[in-house]
Amino acid sequence: MGELVKTIAKALVDNPDAVEVNEIHGHQSIIIELKVAPEDMGKVIGKQGRIAQAIRTLVKAAALKEKKRVIVEII
Amino acid sequence: MKELIRTGKTVEEAINLALKDFGVPRDMVEVEVLDEGGKGFLGLISKQAIVKVVLKDVIKESAKNFLKQVIDAMKLDITFEIEETEDTIKFNLQGKNVGLLIGRRGETLDALQYLVNVVASKYKGYERYRRIILDAGNYRKRREETLTRLARKLAKKVMETKESIELEPMTPNERRIIHLALQDHPYVETYSEGEEPNRRVIIALK
């Protein structure tokens, strides 16, 4: 799941090497923390959060397969 | 600037010079080595390496690479075919997991289509941009037919009851299908209300 967020983020930003993803596993849910270079924040959030929303939609679909709730946080 | 010829001490160095001039990663070009370079006769004179580096169709390549990476990361068993027109590049996704990638009312497919366009539009400066469309198992066509049928059925109901009907929230493209389906209708008209993502079509008597 973290791998998916990393793949998408790396393709969007100008500094792919600065992309960091951290997974926190709970009982029923996983929190994925996404960190990018400060100047790339807009690239993963988008106008009115549209890009962040699209990332969450895709992750939600992937999570369906593993029957877990996934929360993506951009920090 | 679709191809460059560069020289360097080694083939690798010459390729890297061209990549820097193009400003693209290695997988966006094809390389033809014109001269391997290296040491000449008896190692006395060293020859320069010469390469011809040709820029691929970067919009299509970046979209293709991104899609492949996402499908792999989601561990899905999905392949795709590409259909090109003058203004669009369409990827038809196939495989047993396509349902998962379509999602409820196509929301996952729309999200991926949006992202793939964001990624590919990084290369807008290189060639005329062509919009990327994702379809899966003919989903878009079937959805268009369903929405057209729904629009006609609801128009009939509006005429019978003489009351307007508000549809559920839809994407701009889906709203367009409803508007188009009823644009020549003699007795009803359509318009949209509300803000994205809750914008809805209203069907009303003229």
From Swiss-Prot, chain A:
GO terms for cellular component: cytoplasm
Start and end residues of each KH domain: 29-75
Any one GO molecular-function label of the UniProt entry: RNA binding
UniProt keyword terms in alphabetical order: Cell shape, Cell wall biogenesis/degradation, Chaperone, Cytoplasm, RNA-binding
Major subcellular location class: cytoplasm
Highest taxon of source: Bacteria
Any one biological process term the GO annotation gives: regulation of cell shape
Compartments (UniProt record): Cytoplasm
A Pfam family it matches: KH_KhpA-B
Subunit structure as annotated in this protein's UniProt entry: Forms a complex with KhpB.
Function: A probable RNA chaperone. Forms a complex with KhpB which binds to cellular RNA and controls its expression. Plays a role in peptidoglycan (PG) homeostasis and cell length regulation.
Family: Belongs to the KhpA RNA-binding protein family.
Protein name: RNA-binding protein KhpA
Organism whose genome encodes this protein: Caldanaerobacter subterraneus subsp. tengcongensis (strain DSM 15242 / JCM 11007 / NBRC 100824 / MB4) (Thermoanaerobacter tengcongensis)
